[in-house]
């Protein structure tokens, strides 16, 4: 059960903090590592080696930097990968080169207990084919590809344009989005992990993109050796043609029970308590 696990967030900026907020809302123990902001941030931080030693799940949310005291290029090298706890889940949704992918192949073959979820890959758009079968969930750098995310970006440009033109921004971001889905939540107790997973998959089932990724990259490359070229490997094509998923906020939950489930708003769902 996720609530019994300790999750480490490497990189506590906007994305990492959002992940931490969701996990903490669900009651998960979260540890943070971010040497760049720790001196000016009131939250508690620990060293990376301490985080690796303590955490059952590690999620990476750092920019890629090649030089300096806190460079992140190959932050997870062979030594750090080998130091992961037994059964650790390692998630990378930031930049592929934060993990040495060649070392990752070597360590994963030696330690199948480590579980991998990769949205980003060293050498994109040409991921190492040997790595893909070793990964539990694989996607083509689409973690940020949500409809709400696109709408937020468009709305920010709209607001800036209206400011430059000296006009009132009288449109709302919700006008850019389809209407909310409504789901009646009738519970006598806090939804368990299985129920939350069902809700999440109702909005977006990650397994679909995982299946498409493997089929596109592995199956197509075996049939067509030219598929590895920069312009013809399917990776960029999958990103370009990705059907943008909705976020949790697209789901309006109507609570008809008597339990206190307002904490679900911290996961991003809409409508709780209304």
UniProtKB/Swiss-Prot annotation:
Keywords: Cytoplasm, NAD, Oxidoreductase, Pyridoxine biosynthesis. This is Erythronate-4-phosphate dehydrogenase. It is an enzyme of class 1 (oxidoreductase). The keyword Oxidoreductase applies. Its EC number is 1.1.1.290. Homodimer. Pathway: Cofactor biosynthesis; pyridoxine 5'-phosphate biosynthesis; pyridoxine 5'-phosphate from D-erythrose 4-phosphate: step 2/5. GO terms for molecular function: 4-phosphoerythronate dehydrogenase activity; glyoxylate reductase (NADPH) activity; hydroxypyruvate reductase [NAD(P)H] activity; NAD binding; protein dimerization activity. Belongs to the D-isomer specific 2-hydroxyacid dehydrogenase family. PdxB subfamily. Its main location: cytoplasm. InterPro entries: D-isomer_2-hydroxyacid_DH, D-isomer_DH_CS, D-isomer_DH_NAD-bd, Erythronate-4-P_DHase, Erythronate-4-P_DHase_dimer, NAD(P)-bd_dom_sf, PdxB_dimer_sf. It comes from Shewanella sp. (strain DB6705). One of its GO terms (cellular component) is cytosol. The lineage of its organism: Bacteria, Pseudomonadati, Pseudomonadota, Gammaproteobacteria, Alteromonadales. It catalyses: 4-phospho-D-erythronate + NAD(+) = (R)-3-hydroxy-2-oxo-4-phosphooxybutanoate + NADH + H(+). It comes from the Bacteria. The keyword Oxidoreductase applies. Catalyzes the oxidation of erythronate-4-phosphate to 3-hydroxy-2-oxo-4-phosphonooxybutanoate. One of its GO terms (biological process) is pyridoxine biosynthetic process. Substrate binds at residue 145. It is found in: Cytoplasm. The active site is at 95, 124, 141 (proton donor).
